[in-house]
Amino acid sequence: MLRSIVFSKANSGVLIMLFQTDIAGTVVWFVLFFALIFLYPRIMLSQLIYKIEQSAVRIETMSQDAMKITARKVDKNVSKELKNKIEQFSDFFVIEPSNIDPYGLVKKIDHTIRGMESRFDEFVEEVAGDKSYSEKQEINYGIRATIGLRQISKIVRHYVEMAKKFKNLQIAMILQMQLPIIEKIAESEIKGAEAFVNGWPIGDSIGPLVAASYMEKSKEIAEDIMASTTVIEGRKCFVLKAKGPSPHLGRDDEAIAAIMKKNKIARIITIDAAQKLEGEKSGSVAEGVGFAMGGWGQREMIENFLIAKKMPIDSIVVKVGMTDAIIPMTKDVYDSVPVVQDFIKRAVRRTKKSNKIIIIGVGNSSGIGNDKKEIEKVKEVVDMLDKKKKEEEAKQKKGGWF
């Protein structure tokens, strides 16, 4: 009897201890649970801010590197004054004309673009007045790529600071999700700056490259536009491209008007680079209708001019990746030239043999000369860059963990 009483008391003590432990554990668990509800977003925000801060620093470093690349083209011994001038000019901006009254908007845009072009020319003349015309153009477009990268770095930094200042998790998350694409674009801008200052062809140069493949002797017929005549499939063709091999875009609208003033044109064929969809092969070719030209202003003026004449317009595009248009031309894009030429032949055959046609290689002429003899030089540069790219990829693969 006594033993059973002692045993029951011992069991009761154990049960009380267990019960007390369960209560303490439950209280601790609830405290931790509610603490984490408040602390987890803070921890997550801190991690996100750390990551986006690193990305912002990387992009800012790229921006500084792009400035150095351009400055070295001006002078190998970069002075502090030159560096400051380029850095100040990299904040250059263009205000879009008012569109409240759409009448005359295209002319407003054209006027603004011409003003921008003049301002770039003036700045290059100021910092590199002793350079040749071709070198000035390379510096000019190198600065444009530098400005693009500078703006990207400033926008990223703006949102990083916004997330920090207001401790805003949503801003940090949205930015962090977009950063892989933004960094890819930033990388393409610095590669573009390098391509421009070295006079290399870029992805957007495929149109002028195709046009140059038809040119024997060319002459300038409008602002920065070279023209040549050739016969394709028995039809007389006027071939146009921006002046090269230094970077130019040219005034295609003026060139078209000059030719059509003296000749009866039956068809216009445009060749340009176009952004591919993910999954499509870079360098693939497609055809359609309409004037293939990016940007705004000049295309609208051309379309207004041609629509009044009910002119058939064919478009042939070479598909390039999201960032391929500004980076040095890849081998896939270069190898599309014969395919584009086949598309041109088919388009030309849709007109009578007595008809005259205008063929326009739309795009930046960086690295592309003004006749077919220059094509071999382009091939050498593309092969050199392709070899360099493969070596870098092999080095990265060798240095990886797997």
Where are the model-predicted features located?
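Electropositive, gly/pro-rich neighborhoods at or near active sites that engage anionic ligands
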Residues: 50-209, 213-217
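N-terminal signal-anchor transmembrane alpha helix of single-pass membrane proteins
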Residues: 1, 6-16, 20-45
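Intrinsic disorder/low-structure terminal segments
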Residues: 1, 6, 88-92, 401
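Membrane-interfacial segments
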Residues: 44-47, 218
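Arginine residue identity/basic-tract feature
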Residues: 3, 42, 58, 72, ...
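PRPP/pyrophosphate-binding module of the type I phosphoribosyltransferase fold
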Residues: 360
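Conserved mixed alpha/beta catalytic, RNA-binding, or beta-rich assembly cores of soluble enzyme
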Residues: 155-329, 334-339, 345-346, 353, ...
